[in-house]
């Protein structure tokens, strides 16, 4: 079993170290992670400059690029053999609902998924690392289950873990994505040089946390497991759009 491990918080993040330690013994681990924090990088690839690859003292490989860069470089340039599984995390904070569109953690797993490799993203739902060992233990359980009984391809799982002791978790729930309210307004400030700059505001609160969602499950103390796909087509709207577009004419 060959497992590629990445994240978006950077190669020296506690969540990555905890995940690697938790997965030790399950197979041959290769760690390729960003040099610095790339939270919110989504699926971006670096196309305007070359990427450098270095190895840290602990053996982790780090790239001066995005999470997607890391997995892409690992799969197409660094690894001698194709991995059986790609895992990402453990993220410092939730990746639920709309977060998945922006998340570098989910993006690293998505890159593996695009290559046809089963991929799993792990996140601890609150900032800080108070119960990172518990989150790592839950992550190992999910990986062990995938190894023991692999899901039919394609596989892209988004796992969000409550920030509590492992003994206080209320099991696992398979969920759909919830939805957040829009982010808070940008924060405008002035630099010491008199320039006006803007910081993106905090994420919005949950707008859809009804039963069956990732928000609801984690609020109940459950580990949320959400199967994702990358097909963004609104299939239910195809017929409506065909009818709407019928009068359009290139030569009109």
Curated annotation (Swiss-Prot):
Known EC number: 3.1.3.5
Catalytic activity: a ribonucleoside 5'-phosphate + H2O = a ribonucleoside + phosphate
Subcellular location: Cytoplasm
InterPro entries recorded: SurE, SurE-like_Pase/nucleotidase, SurE-like_sf
Obligatory cofactor(s): a divalent metal cation
UniProt: a divalent metal cation binding residues: 8-9, 39, 91
Keyword terms: Cytoplasm, Hydrolase, Metal-binding, Nucleotide-binding
Classification via Gene3D superfamilies: Survival protein SurE-like phosphatase/nucleotidase
Free-text remark on how the cofactor is bound: Binds 1 divalent metal cation per subunit.
Assigned GO CC terms: cytoplasm
Record-level Gene Ontology MF annotations: 3'-nucleotidase activity; 5'-nucleotidase activity; exopolyphosphatase activity; metal ion binding; nucleotide binding
Function statement: Nucleotidase that shows phosphatase activity on nucleoside 5'-monophosphates.
Family: Belongs to the SurE nucleotidase family.
Name of the protein: 5'-nucleotidase SurE
């Amino acid at each position: 079993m060959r497992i590629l491990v990445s994240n978006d918080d950077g190669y020296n993040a506690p969540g990555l170290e905890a995940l690697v330690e938790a997965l030790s013994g399950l197979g041959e681990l290769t760690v390729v992670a960003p040099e610095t924090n790339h939270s919110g990088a989504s699926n971006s690839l670096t196309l305007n400059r070359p990427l450098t690859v270095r190895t840290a003292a602990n053996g982790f490989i780090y790239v001066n690029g995005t999470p997607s860069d890391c997995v892409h470089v690992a799969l197409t340039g660094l690894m001698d053999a194709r991995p059986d599984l790609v895992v990402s995390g453990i993220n410092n904070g939730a990746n639920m609902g709309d977060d998945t569109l922006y998340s570098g953690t989910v993006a690293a797993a998505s890159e593996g998924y695009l290559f046809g490799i089963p991929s799993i993203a792990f996140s601890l739902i609150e900032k800080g690392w108070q119960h990172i060992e518990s989150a790592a233990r839950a992550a190992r359980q999910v990986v062990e289950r995938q190894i023991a009984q692999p899901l039919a391809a394609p596989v892209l799982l988004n796992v969000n873990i409550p920030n509590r002791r492992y003994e206080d978790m209320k099991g696992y729930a398979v969920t759909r994505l919830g939805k957040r309210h829009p982010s808070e307004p940008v924060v405008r400030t002035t630099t010491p040089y008199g320039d006006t700059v803007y910081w993106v505001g905090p994420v919005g609160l949950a707008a859809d946390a009804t039963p069956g969602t990732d928000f609801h499950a984690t609020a109940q103390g459950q580990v949320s497991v959400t199967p994702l796909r990358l097909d963004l087509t609104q299939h239910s709207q195809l017929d409506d759009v065909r009818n709407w577009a019928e009068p359009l004419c290139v030569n009109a």
